[in-house]
Design a protein with these regions (language model features):
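Long, highly hydrophobic alpha-helical transmembrane signal-anchor segments
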Residues: 2-39, 111-126
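Hydrophobic alpha-helical transmembrane segments
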Residues: 27-42, 61-76, 117
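Hydrophobic core of alpha-helical transmembrane segments in multi-pass integral membrane proteins
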Residues: 38-49, 95-100, 125-139
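Membrane-water interface of transmembrane alpha-helices
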Residues: 45-64, 137-146
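Short membrane-interface loop/juxtamembrane segments of multi-pass integral membrane proteins
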Residues: 66-83, 156-160
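Select subsegments of transmembrane alpha-helices in polytopic membrane proteins
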Residues: 81-95
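Juxtamembrane "helix exit" motif at the C-terminal ends of alpha-helical transmembrane segments
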Residues: 94-112
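Short, intrinsically disordered, charge-rich cytosolic tails of integral membrane proteins
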Residues: 146-160
Length: 160
């Protein structure tokens, strides 16, 4: 990988553009839009890391990924939280990086362009989060039956 090509990516990236001018109304609008756009990916990244590093120990009705198949057995519960951690932390990191570039571009936009860019970003975040949640549920349904037992094709240990 060429270092010049990598540096060209960050040519228009201005760290100072992350600080809105709070002495104007547009500056406050810009700050609120940045918080709205960055909150989803950062929460997804945080919960993904939480599910990877410190998942709930057993199935319960208060904390964790509550889904019929995931709560059927301890194995299904652990599988679900491990994969939720992988998917959410990866998607959260990717969206955090992308939305940082979107938020950086807010300074150069007109107010209505800024609002519509934030609305489009929130739509993409919501859509990708929904797809990720559905994919996790489908993966659990494929690997486990409704009683929480691994299907034959996905057994971890073969009995000899």
């Amino acid at each position: 990988m060429n270092l010049d090509a990598l540096m060209a990516i960050f040519t228009g990236f201005d760290v100072a553009a992350f600080l809105p001018e709070l002495d104007t109304l547009i500056g406050w609008v810009e700050m609120v839009l940045r918080i709205l756009v960055m909150a989803g990916p950062l929460l997804m990244l945080g919960f993904g890391l939480l599910y990877l590093l410190a998942p709930p120990k057993e199935a319960n009705y208060s904390v964790g990924w509550r889904f019929w198949w995931s709560m059927a057995s301890l194995d299904a519960w652990q599988f679900t939280h491990r994969w939720t951690g992988y998917v959410w932390s990866g998607l959260g990191l990717l969206l955090t990086l992308i939305m940082a570039f979107v938020c950086n571009a807010f300074r150069r936009m007109d107010p209505m362009q800024m609002v519509w860019a934030a609305v489009k970003s929130l739509g993409w975040e919501l859509g990708l989060m929904g797809i990720a949640c559905i994919a996790i549920n489908v993966a659990v349904i494929i690997v486990f039956d409704k009683d929480g037992y691994r299907r034959k094709d996905y057994a971890e240990y073969e009995e000899e």
